Amino acid sequence: MAPSSQLEFNVVRKQPELLPPAEPTPFEWKELSDIDDQDGLRLHISGFFIYPPSTMSNVGRDNVARDIRLGLSKAMVFYYPLAGRIREGPNRKLSVECTGEGIMYCEADADVRLEQFGDIGALSMPFPFMDKVMFETVDDGILGTPLMYFQSTRFICGGIVIAGCYNHAIADGLGFYMFMAAAAQLARGAASPTPLPVWQRERLLSRVPPRVTFIHHEYIHDTPKTETANPLDNEPWPLHSIFFTRVDVAALRAQLPGHLRKSATSFEIISACLWRCRTAALRFAPDELSRLIIAVNARTKFGPPLPQGYYGNSIMLPMVVSEAGKLVLSGLGYAVELVIEAKGKVTEEYVKSVADYLVLNGRPHYVVTNTYLVSDLRQLVEMSKFDWGWGKPAYVGPADVGENAISFLATLKNGEEEGVVVPIRLPESAVGRFKSEVSKMVSFGCLEDVKPNRDGYLSRM
């Protein structure tokens, strides 16, 4: 069998169609929140749903497309702003015009079996079939264009991949998966989705008058004199996936001081390890600033909390900063303390201060210079929620990390061993250094790239 990265296969797409809501929906204008319309969210984000052939054996090819169309069109009745188009007003303020036009959908067929890419339950980034199962003609802009694009690709084994691409200004990742879970529920015959969607974007608008009460390093674009152009920026940054076992995490935990050894979470430990090792591998100057952003869900930080059905952007991006030399030369506990500090910043007042800062400063992009952003997706989705009547998917999550400086933690079963997989982009010249840095920090062997072995399971190289 040819290695999956070299596998040649074809995908034949049908004519894309504009899929409207199943019923007429209200025509109105809805203002997005001041968190939604920041510059860093004005882009498209993709997600994969991989259904192995074992769940699809009794499902006809036409039935799959029927179920997807039905579920998506019914879900848009409840999530009707998603069938509209985003417009920009004065001061770059975004609103959605609820036009009821709909979203884009395309069917496709692949002349290959899913298992030819390795064990389906252990597939991880980079997905070798990604480009061919994504909707082919996603508009570059976010204004006046469909808010979602979907392609369902049927493989000759009967397996299917649903690839979605959504406008990040209208929803965060949790909101997107909420919509997809609703579509699956409605396709199975539910009268309405649980939870029901809630708009309430006014709860994340800036105050009148705005008052910034925190220092928001994540949006302050000052460039210290010690930061210089990094020649690595001119190299390709291919995507790798690394796998942390429970033993690896335990080895890292053992290095922490006593007060952190029991209290630090696996996310805090892994994020700190990755930040430190990435900084060393990229060879920042000792006095250069290395930045870490931790994505924090603020839904529960409000009093009362945002409703369960809230699908707008509520992920905060608190940043901590360290001189690279201190970060690399200090023990792991130093980096873990900073991760905990970042997470602890997010309160209701912090969220309001972010909205105020964004409005006062032209809705800027978060700082990307020497920045690494980490998110925890392990609790984001429950596989059972995405059963369209065919069974649970083997994978639910992003199709790619997008930018060079973003990683997320996801649960993965590597053969018989369950652990945490983390996709990360690195310049080729830094990959060896990164692996070396991580191997120094774990007492169990050497952490390497995740790749399928001859049995299809993920293994260290």
UniProtKB/Swiss-Prot annotation:
<dbReference type="GO" id="GO:0005737">
    <property type="term" value="C:cytoplasm"/>
</dbReference>
<dbReference type="GO" id="GO:0160181">
    <property type="term" value="P:piperine biosynthetic process"/>
</dbReference>
<comment type="pathway">
    <text>Aromatic compound metabolism.</text>
</comment>
<dbReference type="GO" id="GO:0050199">
    <property type="term" value="F:piperidine N-piperoyltransferase activity"/>
</dbReference>
<feature type="active site" description="Proton acceptor">
    <location>
        <position position="387"/>
    </location>
</feature>
<keyword id="KW-0963">Cytoplasm</keyword>
<dbReference type="InterPro" id="IPR050898">
    <property type="entry name" value="Plant_acyltransferase"/>
</dbReference>
<comment type="function">
    <text>Involved in the biosynthesis of aromatic piperamides natural products such as piperine (1-piperoyl-piperidine), the pungent principle contributing, together with several terpenoids, to the aromatic properties of black pepper fruits, and displaying numerous pharmacological activities such as antiproliferative, antitumor, antiangiogenesis, antioxidant, antidiabetic, antiobesity, cardioprotective, antimicrobial, antiaging, and immunomodulatory effects. Mediates mainly the conversion of piperidine and piperoyl-CoA to piperine.</text>
</comment>
<feature type="active site" description="Proton acceptor">
    <location>
        <position position="168"/>
    </location>
</feature>
<comment type="subunit">
    <text>Monomer.</text>
</comment>
<keyword id="KW-0012">Acyltransferase</keyword>
<keyword id="KW-0808">Transferase</keyword>
<feature type="short sequence motif" description="Microbody targeting signal">
    <location>
        <begin position="459"/>
        <end position="461"/>
    </location>
</feature>
<dbReference type="Pfam" id="PF02458">
    <property type="entry name" value="Transferase"/>
</dbReference>
<protein>
    <recommendedName>
        <fullName>Piperine synthase</fullName>
        <ecNumber>2.3.1.145</ecNumber>
    </recommendedName>
</protein>
<comment type="similarity">
    <text>Belongs to the plant acyltransferase family.</text>
</comment>
<dbReference type="InterPro" id="IPR023213">
    <property type="entry name" value="CAT-like_dom_sf"/>
</dbReference>
